[in-house]
A protein has these predicted regions:
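Bacterial N-terminal signal peptides that target proteins for export
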Residues: 2-16
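Acidic/polar, glycine-enriched structural segments that form the non-catalytic walls/loops
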Residues: 29-380, 399, 410-415
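C-terminal motif of bacterial Sec signal peptides marking the signal peptidase cleavage site
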Residues: 25-27
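Sec-dependent N-terminal signal peptides
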Residues: 16-23
């Protein structure tokens, strides 16, 4: 039997359900209101060591500042990142962006241009790979000396202690130098890219502590913990354009990129070039009296009204207010009455993931895999990963934090339509990896990947379930219809077997098969069914007739591939269980992450069991564990769901700051996936029954939860 026949809701039930959700999007058990502050406070981050890879962070979703144990970037050059900080190196002489036109590939007798690397045009291909890239706005740290004037080094730190107050979004740091205590408070303004810093120490009065500001040039590096080149002195400019008794402003120029840094201090201090330094891009704020230094530092692509900047204390107050509002909004979960010994670590991961995702991934653009910690893939975001970074916000009833970045779909719709037209197809083909404008990074996987294509239909459906209005329909109409039209045109009619197939060429979720031979990948088939089915529902809601072509493709789309009574990665795959049990086990995602269009639940359960036994858990990615957890929950195995969320693989670990493994470090899809799975397991899904249906009913789990939104 087909699962989806059990999940389709009649028109009357759909209206009743939507009426209920419009009044109160709540999934709440009988135990009542949760003490949210107690849940958050018991996972307060407390560290007493120097971490060289893992920063503590403050941020607002668009901007983040990573710090070492001193509360600034004193000994470890962590990064200051934003969603607007993009840079491109100059093009090679004689090379134009228009030189790249794609690479034609035979697709069922048609030569279709795909956005893959062009070996005949290596210069422009290489330039497009690396540009644009995100850059580090600058480094801020303490410049400290001993009584004899020699510089303080990391090994001189004594009794370091740092606490991240998650409830307020403020970092409190302290340590000793030569027996004297130094205290640093660090906070981020919730509404602008500005930091508030407060420093207190007898060393301030002794003239032995200042704050340095060091600006790097953009670098060619990728997958590096430190972003920027601090030695390329002659390739950029740092110009002090104002310098008063209590403020200063710096204009930064890197090739065609400009931005501003502004400082405002509330305690006596002077600002200028750090003269002992060889770098013209290093400056020093030096207190001139008292034991305190309090300042604000702001970054912007536009000139800053320095006199209107908030003080450090005002930023502290605003941060505390905004973070309390965040924690009190949306859903919450409390596992503290459970007796399973894993409850505390699971709850810690849940709380810290909510913090680091709000800091790094609640901005005006979809996030890159490493958020605003460092650069991976040159800082660009991946369209197929938007689901894993953001769906949790909708399920945790914080839709607005996801919605603020989804404008990329209508914004990039015209260029995506052009991309499809160049390929001889209708509709819109979404890119795979891009920055703040729609230009694909030419790469084999990027040009041939397709599982990002139905995403906007899924997001639109989430939005409509939360906001079933004409306004929502109008908002998503063109995106949904053009996404589906491309999907229908992409499917190839196999006349010999009277069916539609996907690929070749196609790069699938796991990216580990031969794209020129792969046909009918299971996850993509399931998602195509979901996307076309849902798009037809949208046509009906819009008062439009069903599109006959879409129904034809739906009705004749190839079934999910089966070998030896279990699902397999793609149709006809050879040696599936001896050669391909690594990378993403996407065959488990068709019923869990997705609602199960075309799935036989008996076959699925056998498949999930086999994957659990035979897949190489140290050769997959962080979001694969939540994907399997959702599959386990939806198929009636909540014990396995918990096992997946607490798996001991090196690919799914969460450090002291909540930063996760699972890919190039840190890997935020691990955090987003965890929150998505937990929301589903607590709040349920279409067709689920009972309270917290994804948690075990073995007497070891007591799950208090409220305000979750059921998953599709």
């Amino acid at each position: 039997m087909s699962l989806i026949s059990d999940l389709l809701i009649s028109g009357r039930k759909q209206l009743v359900w939507m009426a209920a959700i419009s009044l109160s999007v709540v999934a709440c058990n009988e135990t009542g209101k949760i003490d949210r502050r107690a849940v958050v406070e018991r996972h307060r981050i407390v560290t007493d060591s120097v971490y060289h890879r893992s920063p503590a962070q403050v941020g607002n979703g668009n901007f983040a500042f990573g710090v070492d144990v001193t509360g600034l970037q004193t000994f470890v050059p962590f990064n200051t990142m934003s969603h607007w900080s993009w840079h491109s190196f100059p093009l090679p002489d004689g090379v134009k962006v228009e030189d790249y036109t794609g690479v034609p590939m035979d697709t069922y007798g048609k030569m279709i241009p795909y956005e893959v690397g062009d070996p005949n045009k290596p210069e422009i291909t290489a330039w497009l790979v690396a540009n644009p890239h995100r850059f580090n706005l600058g480094r801020i740290g303490l410049q400290m000396t001993h009584a004899d004037g020699s510089p303080v080094v990391e090994s001189d730190l004594m009794n370091p202690h740092q606490e991240v107050d998650l409830w307020k979004g403020i970092i409190y740091s302290s340590f000793q130098i030569d027996g004297e205590k130094v205290e640093v408070t660090t906070a981020c303004d919730p509404d602008q890219d500005a930091l508030g810093v407060y420093i207190k120490s007898p060393l301030v009065a002794q003239g032995r502590i200042g704050v340095f500001f060091d600006f790097p040039y953009a670098d060619h590096g990728d997958f590096r913990d430190t972003v920027g080149d601090y030695n390329a002195y002659d390739k950029h400019r740092s110009e002090v354009i104002s310098n008063g008794s209590q403020s200063a402003e710096i204009l930064r120029t890197m090739d065609s990129t400009t931005y501003y840094t502004a400082l405002k201090w509330a305690t006596p201090a002077s600002f200028g070039q750090d003269t002992p330094s060889d770098s013209p891009h290093r400056f020093l704020l030096m207190p001139t009296e008292g034991e305190e230094l309090m300042f604000t530092c702001a970054f912007s692509p536009d000139a800053i009204a320095v006199d209107q900047l908030p003080s450090a204390s005002q930023i502290d107050e605003a941060s505390a207010k905004a973070w309390e509002a965040y924690w009190m909004s949306g859903a919450a979960i409390d596992l503290s009455e459970s007796t399973d010994p894993r409850w505390e670590e699971l709850e810690r991961r849940i709380v810290l993931s909510q913090y680091v995702l709000r800091v790094n991934e609640a901005g005006d653009l979809p996030p890159q895999e490493s958020g605003l910690v460092n650069n991976g893939w040159f800082g660009r975001f991946h369209y197929e990963m938007i689901w894993w970074h953001g769906v949790h916000y909708g399920l945790w009833n914080r839709w607005e934090l996801f919605d603020r970045s989804l404008h990329i779909f209508p914004d990039f719709l015209p260029t995506s339509i052009q991309r499809a037209q160049k390929m001889g197809r209708r509709g819109a083909k979404w890119p795979k990896c891009t920055a703040d404008f729609d230009r694909e990074w030419p790469c084999w996987a990027h040009g041939l990947l397709i599982w990002q294509q139905p995403h906007p239909i899924y997001f639109a459906e989430m939005d409509y379930r939360l906001h079933p209005t004409q306004e929502t329909l109008d908002k998503w109409k063109d995106v949904v219809l053009n996404s589906a039209q491309y999907m229908a045109d992409y499917a190839h009619y196999d006349a010999a077997n009277d069916r539609y197939v996907l690929g070749p060429p196609v790069v699938i979720v796991s990216e580990n098969t031969d794209a020129l031979k792969t046909v009918n990948p299971i996850f993509e088939l399931g998602y195509w069914r979901y996307g076309l089915r849902t798009a037809q529902q949208w046509r009906e809601r819009l008062g439009m007739p069903r599109e006959p072509q879409w129904d034809t493709v739906l009705n004749k789309l190839s079934p999910l591939p089966i070998q030896d009574s279990v699902y397999v990665t793609y149709e006809g795959i050879p040696d599936m269980w001896t050669k391909y049990t690594f990378e993403h086990p996407a065959l488990t995602g068709v019923f869990g992450m997705l609602p199960g269009d075309g799935v036989d639940t008996t076959v699925y359960r056998r498949t999930l069991d086999k994957v659990n036994r035979e897949w190489q858990s140290d050769r997959i990615w962080g979001w694969d564990f939540p994907m399997m957890a959702m599959g386990a929950a939806r198929s009636g195995n909540p014990e396995l769901a918990i096992d997946m969320l607490m798996h001991n693989s090196k690919q799914f670990r969460f450090d002291e700051h909540g930063l996760a493994s699972g890919g190039p470090w840190p890997y935020f899809p691990s955090n987003g996936g965890l929150l998505t799975a937990v929301a589903m397991m607590a709040g349920g899904w279409d067709g689920s029954q009972g309270e917290a249906p994804g948690f075990p009913k073995n007497g070891k789990w007591v799950v208090k939860y409220e305000n979750f939104v059921p998953m599709q």
